[in-house]
């Protein structure tokens, strides 16, 4: 298994100085896709500036000072991605996108402490007639709820992933754009155009633009809106 790559070849979504080092570690498979995740080593060293040497970051991890979504993580190659909560020495950070499509790590608003939004990517029926839901971060959940649809966002408590609310992929709801020319923007769904072909459904916004449904991450309804860091919500 290839554990590192030349930093010039690292995923373009990483917001790092590409001339500062020669090598960059690769994210482990299993959570977010490689091109949409930040290995913890890079997150702690290059983003949060908690150490300059790999051994300094390894020491922080070994001492159980780092959590992802409320669970202690010691693996330096563990990848974190959009909507993950990174906790270091009690301080919470949220992984998001800036207006250039780069992954950023910003202080997490206090009102969202202990909460996470998960976008539904797929559903399958399992034994007993229950439903297994797969999410954007690679995680899954088995539930009896049949009202949860693809494209919806599920608000959960972390780390146990107890469902708090379901934000529907529907007109009138607020969304965060995760790709395309409007990446990093927050908008409101005006209408959803269902394609009869194999092409992606189009989502039209009140703000006057449209994008494919896979770039739309529901973050708010008339009753609740998940607060994003100020630098992203502007």
Swiss-Prot record:
What the entry lists under SMART domains is as follows: KOW
Query: Sorted alphabetically, which Pfam families does this protein's record hold?
Result: Ribosomal_S4e (PF00900)
Q: Which UniProt keywords apply?
A: Ribonucleoprotein, Ribosomal protein, RNA-binding, rRNA-binding
Record-level GO cellular component terms: cytosolic small ribosomal subunit
Domain called S4 RNA-binding: residue spans = 38-99
GO molecular function ontology, one term from the record? structural constituent of ribosome
Gene Ontology process terms (BP): translation
In Swiss-Prot or TrEMBL terms, this protein is called Small ribosomal subunit protein eS4
Its family remark reads:
Belongs to the eukaryotic ribosomal protein eS4 family.
Q: InterPro entries annotated for this entry?
A: KOW, Rib_uL2_dom2, Ribosomal_eS4, Ribosomal_eS4_central_region, Ribosomal_eS4_central_sf, Ribosomal_eS4_KOW, S4_RNA-bd_sf
């Amino acid at each position: 298994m290839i554990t590192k790559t030349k930093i010039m070849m690292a995923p373009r979504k990483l917001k790092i100085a590409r001339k500062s080092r020669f090598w960059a570690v690769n994210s482990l498979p299993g959570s977010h896709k490689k091109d949409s995740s930040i290995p913890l080593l890079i997150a702690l060293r290059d983003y949060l500036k908690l150490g300059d040497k790999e051994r300094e970051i390894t020491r922080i991890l070994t001492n159980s000072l780092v959590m992802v979504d409320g669970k202690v993580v010691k693996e330096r190659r563990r990848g974190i991605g959009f909507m993950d909560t990174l906790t270091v020495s009690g301080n919470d950070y949220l992984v998001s996108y800036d207006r250039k499509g780069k992954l950023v790590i910003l202080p997490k608003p206090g009102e969202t402490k202990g909460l996470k939004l998960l976008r539904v990517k797929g559903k399958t029926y399992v034994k007993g007639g229950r439903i297994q839901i797969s999410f954007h971060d690679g995680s899954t959940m088995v539930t009896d709820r049949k009202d949860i649809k693809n494209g919806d966002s599920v608000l959960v408590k972390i780390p146990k992933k107890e469902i708090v609310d379901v934000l529907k992929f529907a007109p009138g709801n607020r969304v965060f754009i995760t790709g395309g020319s409007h990446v990093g923007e927050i908008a409101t769904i005006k209408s959803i155009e269902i394609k009869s072909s194999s092409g992606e459904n189009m989502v039209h916004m009140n703000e006057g633009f449209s994008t494919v449904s896979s770039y739309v991450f529901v973050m708010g309804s008339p009753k609740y809106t998940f607060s994003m860091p100020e630098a992203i919500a502007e």
